């Protein structure tokens, strides 16, 4: 599930397909025939060696210096053999009629980053899915759609909205390429005029682009269109006395401001802490700001 696999083999040919496991998604297949090959260390994804093998092959688990740690004989009826990240291995045919197929897998949250080079799934989304089960979900301000696409891949019923028609078109194109049932459309968040109810509404690093005077109405609209027992997740930059924001954002939260908007909700997480943006400064360093991260559950 990466756009450019770091494994090195003598022969390789990738046929991309989606193959889902419970917690992992498959990115590509590699087919080998005729001679031995060595797979160097790979990181961040799982490699499953399918038993689509003509005749037999011997698999060696290796140390970095080539020392053999274990040997396995694979035949067409051997089932699936799994090699985990940070492992080296070598496959050698035991006769001339040899073919093997490899499948590469990674965590679903890394799928679109590794396969398509998109921004990685936001850490707050990764954490939220440990609490919020698959449900009807709204991504407010989806941008390129990396969070919405991950959630759709993970089984959530996702609608993604953004003010940019180009961003929406890009998300829909990616969803179609990956055969995901994700909805996306253009929407002005400042209008605070949602027309559907959801179990989970989130806005990650979006409020900084919104009209400051519309924020109370936007949050009230989010809350009104969250079903009882549903969740809101907001991550946004802050401007506080101890950590002033020098970026030209249209809006930043003050200390404890977001908490007050959700005084009647159950705050499952509320954190005001220094963090890094994906954007960089003139020296190429990630911009450091104070952020508020909140996951709140609506009563009911």
From Swiss-Prot:
The gene is hag1. It is a single-pass membrane protein. GO terms for cellular component: cytoplasm; plasma membrane. This is Hemagglutinin 1. The chain crosses the membrane at residues 200-221. GO terms for biological process: response to tellurium ion. InterPro entries: RmlC-like_jellyroll, SAM-dependent_MTases_sf, TehB-like_dom, Tellurite-R_MeTrfase_TehB, Tellurite-R_TehB-2. Keywords: Cell membrane, Hemagglutinin, Membrane, Transmembrane, Transmembrane helix. Induces agglutination of neuraminidase-treated erythrocytes. It is found in: Cell membrane. Signal peptide: none annotated. Its main location: membrane. GO terms for molecular function: S-adenosylmethionine-dependent methyltransferase activity. Pfam families: TehB. NCBIfam families: PRK11207.1, PRK12335.1, tehB.
């Amino acid at each position: 599930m990466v756009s450019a696999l770091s494994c090195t083999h003598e022969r390789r040919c990738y046929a991309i397909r989606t193959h889902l496991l419970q917690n992992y998604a498959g990115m590509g297949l590699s087919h080998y025939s005729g001679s031995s090959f060595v797979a160097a260390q790979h990181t961040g994804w799982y490699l499953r060696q399918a038993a689509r093998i003509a005749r037999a092959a011997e698999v060696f688990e290796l140390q970095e210096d080539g020392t053999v740690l274990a040997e396995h004989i694979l035949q067409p009826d051997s089932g699936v053999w799994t090699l985990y990240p940070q492992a080296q291995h070598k496959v050698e045919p035991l006769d001339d009629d040899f073919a093997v197929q490899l499948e590469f897998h990674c965590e679903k949250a890394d799928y679109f980053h590794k396969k398509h080079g998109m921004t990685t799934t936001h850490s707050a989304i990764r954490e939220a899915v440990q609490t919020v089960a698959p449900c009807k979900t709204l991504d407010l301000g989806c941008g390129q759609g990396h969070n919405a696409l991950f959630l759709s891949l993970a089984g959530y019923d996702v609608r993604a909205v953004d003010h940019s028609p180009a961003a929406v078109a890009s998300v829909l194109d990616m969803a179609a390429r990956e055969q995901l049932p994700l909805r996306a459309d253009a929407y002005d968040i400042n209008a605070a005029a949602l027309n559907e109810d959801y179990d989970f509404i989130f806005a990650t690093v979006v409020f900084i682009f919104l009209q400051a005077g519309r924020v109370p109405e936007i949050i009230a609209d989010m809350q009104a269109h969250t079903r009882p027992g549903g969740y809101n997740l907001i991550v946004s930059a802050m401007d506080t006395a101890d950590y002033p924001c020098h970026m030209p954002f249209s809006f930043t939260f003050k200390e404890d401001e977001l908490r007050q908007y959700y005084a009647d909700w159950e705050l499952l997480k509320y954190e005001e802490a220094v963090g890094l943006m994906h954007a960089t400064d003139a020296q190429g360093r990630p911009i450091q700001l104070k952020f508020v991260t909140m996951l709140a559950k609506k009563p009911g």
